[in-house]
């Protein structure tokens, strides 16, 4: 999410006025309320009430209320971020939730957003036309919103992939049936072929998508906002690498070897 918060922050300087569409009542494990201040005053923020089953999932898994990053400590970060979609031993609740998540909510639990969002945004765009639609995923359901909106309106659409879809490391841990796996691949292909442009976050993902579609696939890697790092950093004699994101047993950063 931070990726497009920062894009929205700097797009006005490039002559673009962003319109941000976001749920009015999302279900999240953690929130960073400081990010709202990053949205430029030129941007219009459009919200819509949605339904998603994640709240039910959290209760089933025994997870508590949403955690504000201001109060997040190292201890509860480890506790809250135990990811059942990896090689860890899972209890029956985790196994059941993974099976339901992978086979009933395709491509992800946010699929419940798609129809109401398309219906809402079609009406919005009739009164407030835009030059281009941009979706970012995961959740990959956001790309289904972009696909349907672009098909209905003819507006060019850019699909930004912050992670791959069916080649994501945890995809094989979802316990997919043959039918569900085929549907994932079919939806992924429809997004890649239906987009005006596809953006990948790494050369590897870019190459994978290029082999799958004739749609132009551009590369925009993750970066950082210099305003967030104004303080001078004193380096020591050690060589340090910071990895910000998931690093599971399935991940193999071959470039480092």
Language-model segments: residues:
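Conserved catalytic-core segment of nucleotide-activated headgroup transferases in glycan assembly
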Residues: 225-257
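N-terminal subdomain of nucleotide-sugar transferases
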Residues: 1-67, 217
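An aromatic- and histidine-rich active-site surface loop
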Residues: 102-118, 133-153, 159-162, 167
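Membrane-proximal helix-turn-helix segments that form the acceptor-binding/catalytic region
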Residues: 7, 14, 119, 141-144, ...
């Amino acid at each position: 999410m931070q990726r497009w918060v920062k894009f929205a922050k700097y797009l006005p300087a490039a002559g673009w006025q962003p319109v941000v569409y976001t749920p009015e009542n999302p279900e999240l494990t953690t929130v960073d309320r400081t990010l709202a201040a990053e949205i430029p005053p030129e941007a219009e923020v459009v919200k819509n009430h949605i339904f998603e089953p994640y709240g039910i999932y959290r209760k089933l898994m025994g997870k508590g209320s949403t955690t504000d990053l201001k109060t997040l400590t190292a201890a509860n970060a480890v506790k809250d971020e135990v990811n059942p979609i990896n090689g860890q031993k899972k209890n029956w609740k985790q196994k059941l939730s993974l099976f339901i998540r992978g086979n009933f909510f395709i491509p992800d639990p946010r699929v419940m957003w798609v129809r109401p969002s398309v219906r809402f945004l079609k009406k919005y765009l009739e009164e407030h036309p835009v030059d281009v639609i941009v979706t970012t995923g995961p959740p990959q359901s956001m790309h289904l919103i972009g696909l349907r909106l672009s098909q209905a309106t003819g507006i060019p659409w850019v699909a930004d992939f912050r992670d791959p879809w069916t080649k994501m490391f945890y995809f094989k841990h979802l316990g997919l049936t043959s039918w569900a796996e085929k549907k994932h691949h079919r939806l992924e292909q429809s997004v890649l072929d239906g987009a005006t442009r596809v953006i990948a976050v790494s050369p590897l993902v870019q190459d994978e998508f290029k082999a799958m579609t004739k749609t132009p696939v551009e590369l925009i890697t993750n970066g950082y906002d210099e305003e967030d790092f104004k303080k001078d950093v004193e380096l020591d004699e050690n060589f340090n690498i910071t990895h910000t994101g998931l690093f599971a047993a399935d991940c193999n950063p071959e470039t480092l070897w």
